[in-house]
């Protein structure tokens, strides 16, 4: 029994050791399997990173693609297996080439002017949309076959074809187009800029009765402008053609613009067309540094005038500061842009398209700077000088602004105040002595306020007095009367401002603008303050 018990005990111990060893081996196996899974995941991640790095490296190592402009399909055919074999003419930069077309790119869909993509073997592999960017050119002429003569800012003319998208659009002379880098194709039509701010269109309500002191000038312009419009049958009966244009010239601020507006209003009332049209243009605003832009604006103005006059309405094209726009060619005073602007203006004035119901009225302070071709008979052949108002005319002007309806000093009528005001302004005495001017002979002459007064100055004096009356009324809470004292203060302020403006004035320019003889004044000596 003892021997059996010992053997049984040994067997039990051996089995326990065997179980423990199996557990150890199982745990070791689990640990190895976990490590194997971790290594497998790490290997998978490494493989993915390696694949990604390889893809990035392949991308970085890829050859560059080249952009080119499509010109035309050179050749195209399909073999027995249905594979396309085609070539095309393209231009890249300055290189003009014939290159193959990839089989997956349909040659029939390649359009002239479109952007194509070339691979490293100079094979067309893709086609892009027409480039919307590029240099801008102005169309000078549209040829019968659709090609365009375009000019750059320097006036250099190039012959170009239209790109596929532009071939279907209506292109006219004066339009602007973008061109490709090779300047072989016109790509897109540039939208026309809104030039409405350059031309003020209005129906004037100014009448000749609103203008004072210019009876002689009004009569002359009525004879030149209003009579031909209102009595067309008589002019036709006597085979007499109305003037194409009128030039109003003289010192600034004396009613040139008012006269033009009154003419437009009078023509409208007498024509029975309902309303006249007054197109007001500022000469300097038409000047543009880009070649062809000023000419385009002039064409636009006359085209608009013809459109407005088509229904029988009289149209006045009023060009203010005409000397800045139509300066004498070759004068060298500016960049000589007038060498093209003047001919364009004259061609519109003399052109084959009639200017029925259209009258051009120009205004200028410097008639000596306007090109003589503009002033010759048959163009702006009626020239009316608008002089500075004398004392009698000044009374007529002031009566438009100083009326009996205003709160005046009791017992004093507007007519009496006007006489006092005019006497003060036109006084030839030391208290209205502005300056002395010296001519080319060294002779000094006095200049008084009356020598530089204008209709605008007279209105300004009355407005100053009215403003003072308003301020006094606000401070005192009672209506203040306009009287001799307020008018005298207004005249004194206007005199002092005018005298101060003379201090820094250039003698030659000041004398020309103020209507003195050209070149007559060489020096200005202001009076002591």
UniProtKB/Swiss-Prot annotation:
Which residues lie in coiled coils?
Answer: 15-62
Alphabetical UniProt keywords: ATP-binding, Coiled coil, Nucleotide-binding
Decide whether keyword Coiled coil is in the record: yes
GO biological process per UniProt: modification-dependent protein catabolic process; proteasomal protein catabolic process
Q: Which domain of life is it from?
A: Bacteria
Q: According to its record, what are the GO cellular component terms? A: proteasome complex
- Where does the chain bind ATP? 253-258
Q: Which Pfam families match?
A: AAA (PF00004), Prot_ATP_ID_OB_C (PF16450), Prot_ATP_ID_OB_N (PF17758)
A molecular function annotated in GO for this UniProt entry is: ATP hydrolysis activity
| Keyword flag Nucleotidyltransferase | no
List membrane-spanning regions. none
Quaternary state and partners of this protein?
A: Homohexamer. Assembles into a hexameric ring structure.
Family listed: Belongs to the AAA ATPase family.
Q: What is this protein called?
A: AAA ATPase forming ring-shaped complexes
